Amino acid sequence: MSDDVDAPDLAVGHLPRRLANRHIQLIAIGGTIGTGLFMGSGRTISHAGPAVLVVYGIVGFFLFFVLRAMGELLLSNLNYKSFVDFAADLLGPGAGFFVGWSYWFAWIITGTAEIVAITGYAKFWWPDLPAWLPALVTVALILAFNLFSVRNFGEIEFWFALIKLVAIVCFILAGAILLATHFVSPQGDPATIENLWNDGGFFATGFAGVVSGFQVATFAFVGVELVGTAAAETANPRRVLPRAINAVPLRISIFYIGALLAILVVVPWRQFASGQSPFVMMFSLAGLAAAASVVNFVVITSAASSVNSGLFSTGRTLFGLADEGSAPSPFRRLNRGGVPGPALLATAALLLTSIPLLYVHGSVIGAFTLLTIVSSLLFMFVWAMIIVSYLVYRRRHQQRHADSIYRMPAGVAMCWAVLAFFAFVIWTLSTERETAIALAWFPLWLAVLAVGWLIIRRRPRHTETYRRFQIEMNRPVDQETVELVGPR
């Protein structure tokens, strides 16, 4: 007998809350730490110099308030499964359509890019390995973990995040030991706190350098909103979600600022090239002969973590879009494990488009690089829509805000400050040729969505589905399910 008959409660139903506190805490860490910290931070240092510490701190500060706004919205109505739901409910079905499909596309591109990267990292150990094999194995394994239970996703992401966490802690400890022992590099450079200002000053690259640092640093935080995507499947979200979000500033201080501070006091900042990993340099200086292999392993797990997060996020996003009538109805179906199986399978198939990219060069790779920058812009678009949703929520649901157990600090005023910061980041993108080209292409995606929305909205079935969606969003919350505390 089919799953539809055997499991009528899951065929078209609600995502079960099976993620425990430890899963959410490590998912939040994994979302905060991207592959860019391990491989791209050298580029950020070469652009901004020691002021990179301030740049990452400012970006993290504003994104923390995006998460606080998202947290208050999700906890104000536990029928919201993600930010796509509250955007559709508060801003209208068009906003849900734009936010959902933008987030879906952003993760498809990001996941594809990470799979291409995994293939490159695998060739570090096995140079003769067929290019298609690591890509196929990665997608197959990640799909297998995600297809049967959300707890499988939580477990694998838990361990991926733990590996990144251990690597960063070891990195910081190595820097502290080298500093305490007055280490001198083979080039004759001593490890000293004075490296932060003794070569051109703290803001050595000037205003232009700091501005270019914002371009790189902002997109290093892609995935920080992942904890909101997992909210619908979190046991006891009223307790777990605030804990995960409130810990973000400390995590940014340790994982980004702490790690970058460790390398800057050991190695003069001008020695970094754009493509150089500070982690490889630090572990090599600390005497770890296998430094490159260790970092390669960490980067592969970090990239696999991103693919895992991408598959999870896109599957849930398609589920939410179908729930409100903005995606084909089969994507609203849950399998026996309580996960959106059809949505996950469709996403996995699209991720396999990474394989042809491994065999092309030239203009196609250039176009793909352009798309990855556009996908980063899409993440910022989603962050901005979270803030806009919060502004509408404050105007429309004053009582909900008054009753909220998790209010956003500084509320409306901070929302406008965050939007002003995003406008500043967009301006910084216009100052570099590569990012300016991506910025110019970005409206094309919005135009494609606009055409899709004009087609979708005319369908009577969409109107009826959205009406049912609104009823669903305003139904009484099942307190027994919400207050369930899963295993730790």
What function would you assign to each model-found segment?
Residues 85-88, 92, 124, 197-200, ...:
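TM-loop-TM module centered on a large, flexible mid-protein loop between adjacent transmembrane helices
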Residues 159-160, 331-341, 380-432:
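C-terminal membrane-solvent junction of multi-pass transporters and transport-like membrane proteins
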Residues 2-8, 84-88, 115-135, 167-170, ...:
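Helix-loop-helix connectors at the membrane interface of multi-pass transporters/channels
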Residues 3-15, 52-53, 127-130, 162-297:
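Helix-loop-helix junctions that connect adjacent transmembrane segments
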Residues 16, 39-134, 138, 248-257, ...:
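Extracellular loop-to-transmembrane helix junctions
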Residues 119, 133-191, 245-249, 376-385, ...:
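Membrane-interface loop-to-helix entry segments
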Residues 179, 369, 374-382, 408-488:
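A generic transmembrane alpha-helix motif of multi-pass inner-membrane proteins
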